[in-house]
Regions:
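An amphipathic alpha-helix adjacent to DNA-recognition modules
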Residues: 15-20, 32-33, 52-76
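Solvent-exposed, amphipathic alpha-helical segments
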Residues: 21, 25-28, 104, 108, ...
Length: 196
């Protein structure tokens, strides 16, 4: 999923400032250890304003995950390039101060409330758009692609697994692309070679 660098902007609305503060909080603290009061204090607004703007902590968490992942960009210009798009995204180097969706997800794995929100995000913002673009792909396989990407991302960015960080980057990229294509059951004729 596209990467997100969080930085203040003088043109940000209060709602946008709240969302940026939430992304920062949720990427550094678990869902259960992050309160609306903390986020409100980070922005300098009343907690009631945060609630009016987003409705609940769960809805704010969902918006933070969605904004950090920008899933709509993944499926906007697919045209047979989805395995390449997903591969480039998961293998791209993380820039300083960059927050990725996995940074938020990893902080809140153990929270049942966060898991419900993450499941909703997976369904609505990854599985459904993928299946809409590729109607022959079962929902189960779309979810398996997400699982594979999460695993690669965790091993690469969190565990720092040497086989994913050292060696032939082009070979790794091709391996990941082919695994995604295999999960989706896309044959060589289904892939646009101009995506490479």
């Amino acid at each position: 999923m596209p990467n997100r660098v969080i930085s203040p902007d003088a043109n940000d609305t209060t709602r946008e400032r709240i969302l940026k503060a939430a992304i920062l909080r949720f990427s550094a603290h678990s869902y259960d250890n992050t309160g609306l009061r903390d986020i409100a204090a980070d922005v300098g607004v009343d907690m009631a304003y945060v609630q009016r703007s987003f409705g609940s902590k769960e809805k704010l968490f969902y918006e933070a995950v969605k904004e950090s992942g920008k899933p709509e960009q993944l499926f906007a210009d697919d045209d047979g390039c989805l395995p390449s798009i997903l591969t480039k995204q998961i293998l791209s180097r993380k820039a300083a101060n960059e927050i990725r969706v996995l940074d938020i997800v990893i902080q809140s794995f153990a929270s049942p409330a966060a898991s419900r929100v993450l499941n909703e995000f997976l369904e609505e913002d990854f599985v459904t758009p993928l299946v809409s673009k590729h109607p022959m792909v079962p929902r189960r396989r779309a979810a398996l692609v997400a699982a594979f990407l999460a695993g690669v991302g965790i091993l690469k960015d969190v565990i720092k697994a040497d086989p994913l960080l050292k060696g032939d980057a082009a070979a790794l990229e091709e391996d990941v692309r082919m695994v995604i294509a295999a999960i989706l059951e896309l044959g060589p004729n289904d892939l646009d070679t101009s995506c490479d």
